[in-house]
């Protein structure tokens, strides 16, 4: 489990109108990184990922959530 002290909301799925939507947060506690919020995937997706740890998970987010990072 990764411990994170502070997050800064960056943006959400461009097609979302309300809460409960995929989004991206920047870690702002001195650790460089991001937290991605997305929909849980089914076990079949997890099985397709070659290397995934027992303490890791796979989530789906629309491409527009992460594509915006290129413009940063």
Regions found by a protein language model. Give the residues of each.
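Acidic/proline-rich low-complexity IDRs
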Residues: 6, 23, 65-68
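Pocket-edge structural micro-motifs
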Residues: 11, 37-38, 63
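A short, structured beta-strand/loop element
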Residues: 16-56
């Amino acid at each position: 489990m990764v411990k994170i002290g502070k997050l800064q909301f960056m943006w959400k799925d461009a097609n979302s109108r309300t809460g409960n939507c995929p989004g991206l947060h920047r870690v702002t506690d001195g650790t460089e990184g991001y937290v991605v919020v997305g929909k849980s995937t089914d076990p079949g997706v997890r099985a397709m990922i070659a290397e995934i740890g027992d303490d890791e998970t796979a989530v789906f987010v629309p491409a527009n959530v992460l594509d915006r990072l290129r413009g940063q």
